[in-house]
A protein has these predicted regions:
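Conserved beta-sheet core of the metallophosphoesterase superfamily
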Residues: 46-47, 53-147
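Short acidic-hydrophobic surface loop/beta-edge motif
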Residues: 31-42, 89-96
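Core catalytic region of metal-dependent phosphoesterases/phosphodiesterases
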Residues: 1-30
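Residues that cap or initiate secondary-structure elements
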Residues: 8, 41-43, 137
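Extended low-complexity acidic/polar segments
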Residues: 22-30, 34-38, 71-78
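MPN/JAMM (Mov34/JAB) isopeptidase/deubiquitinase module and associated MPN-bearing subunits/adaptors
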Residues: 138-165
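General small-molecule cofactor/ligand-binding pocket signal
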Residues: 28-29, 36, 48-50, 103
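Short, structured patches in soluble enzyme cores that scaffold and shape functional sites
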Residues: 2-4, 39, 49-53
């Protein structure tokens, strides 16, 4: 899935994210998407992806997704971009015990004249994030969702995980 956000405002009349999604056959939404992934074992995992979540903190870049997790719809994964910063936090839903993952992903925008001109700090750990879901673990287990900042490492973990079955 791909969330566009405001990329069309920076790239002229068309949205490059929409073009990439079409080329890859990926789900494309303009600002948000909530997905429920259904696994053969019966596990259901909910993903809440937005260009950004309301709320910010100078101390915690993951504040917006964390706020949505604690006050919102109780999904398993909350992921947003917008400010091109990386952050991650795991929370436990006190009502039903599920582990909720709040993620901010930077981007592949390496050369950012706009950020440099305005003095924005480089808070990008990685240009991407990959979540690998182990549907065999209970939704209360924090490792049901594993977060990786390197796609190759995520692929190796997924291969290892599948080999255990």
């Amino acid at each position: 899935y791909m969330i566009a956000g405001n990329h069309d405002a920076w790239s002229g009349s068309s949205d490059p994210i929409k073009w990439i999604a079409k080329q890859q056959g990926a789900l494309y939404k303009s600002s948000e998407a909530r997905l429920e992934l259904n696994f053969p074992c019966g596990r259901k995992v909910r993903v809440n992806a937005r260009h950004d979540f309301a709320g910010s903190s100078i101390w915690n870049p993951a504040h917006g997704p964390m706020k949505a997790a604690m006050l919102g719809s109780r999904d398993h994964i909350y992921v947003a971009g917008h400010k091109h910063e990386s952050a991650y936090s795991v929370l436990k839903d006190p009502q039903n015990g599920i582990a909720m993952h709040a993620i901010k992903v930077a981007s592949y925008k390496v050369y950012d004249r706009y950020a440099k001109e305005r003095g924005f700090r480089d808070n990008a750990l990685s240009p991407c994030v990959v979540t690998v879901i182990n549907p065999d673990l209970p939704e209360t287990h924090p490792d049901m969702v594993k977060v990786f900042w390197e796609p190759e490492v995520a692929a190796e973990y997924l291969t290892w995980l599948r080999g255990r079955r």
